[in-house]
Amino acid sequence: MDTRSGSQCSVTPEAIRNNEELVLPPRISRVNGWSLPLHYFRVVTWAVFVGLSLATFRIFIPLLPHSWKYIAYVVTGGIFSFHLVVHLIASCIDPADSNVRLMKNYSQPMPLFDRSKHAHVIQNQFCHLCKVTVNKKTKHCISCNKCVSGFDHHCKWINNCVGSRNYWFFFSTVASATAGMLCLIAILLYVLVQYLVNPRVLRTDPRYEDVKNMNTWLLFLPLFPVQVQTLIVVIIRMLVLLLDLLGLVQLGQLLIFHIYLKAKKMTTFEYLINTRKEESSKHQAVRKDPYVQMDKGFLQQGAGALGSSAQGVKAKSSLLIYKCPCHFCTSVNQDGDSKAQEADDAPSTSTLGLQQETTEPMKTDSAESED
């Protein structure tokens, strides 16, 4: 494929440069989260879910007293089960525009986009790549290479686009994961406190009657009891607690961010569009100010330097770089290149969907969403 600039150049929706390597959208459109190749974020998601489930239901809940044990099984089990269901639904749904689902043959490769014929991928609500009429909220996702109705963002954690068809399942996935993390932290803290105060409270299972050594604990109760030393239990508990806290911080940020978006009646895509416009306006204002000069990391006013090189870099970064609160789901190109998008409404450097088209092939430093 020729990726040189020129009006006669035919390219796929977006060609993006990541660490000096040109990355192109898939020629075969993705159907849902199970379309190959699976992103490694998705593999990590399932590995963490399985690992935390085993630790919760086979190691730590069996240590609880009988009165708390069954409550923990019901509450935590219900949350984990609900999370599994909504996660699967969010991944399995095809979020494409209704006309795309009705008329598109997913086994056929996508056509190349000819910039000499069309200024935009979507014009007058018609996609020149999907060859269908789409609704006003539809965007053409560069990661799935198809039009997504009510496009919000492309989530690598579920390996699927998030649009109007699966948004609430995605939101429920995040909310239930956060609730599950909170339940697990409560269980871990209870086990830790009881171990320090009265370890016998954690040894109420009948199988402990045959264990005389107080430094010996049983894991994977009640089906496959395995005897281990206290140090092993402590190491497992600390690793699970660390993983749980890290996950809770990220999921909590993401959940709060999407609650904020719903309160503002915005999508992630629209939020990034507006934010990038504000950042661009601030940057332009600084560049036009004759008393403020930013050059090679120095912030100067007139002839007098106001800070060191490091301070200048920090000040410059604060004006030029924006990081989305949901950075584990989405990322936005930070080089200020307006050639990263294609659409009919407003230009943007967000890499979540295709907005304003230009006459040159799109080359950006950041190419994909990170969920």
Curated annotation (Swiss-Prot):
Residues 347-359 have a biased composition (Polar residues). Residues 360-371 have a biased composition (Basic and acidic residues). It is found in: Membrane. GO terms for biological process: antiviral innate immune response; protein targeting to membrane. GO terms for cellular component: endoplasmic reticulum; Golgi apparatus; membrane. Keywords: Acyltransferase, Lipoprotein, Membrane, Palmitate, Transferase, Transmembrane, Transmembrane helix. Its EC number is 2.3.1.225. It is a multi-pass membrane protein. It catalyses: L-cysteinyl-[protein] + hexadecanoyl-CoA = S-hexadecanoyl-L-cysteinyl-[protein] + CoA. Probable palmitoyltransferase that could catalyze the addition of palmitate onto various protein substrates and be involved in a variety of cellular processes. May play a role in cell proliferation. This is Probable palmitoyltransferase ZDHHC11B. It comes from Homo sapiens (Human).
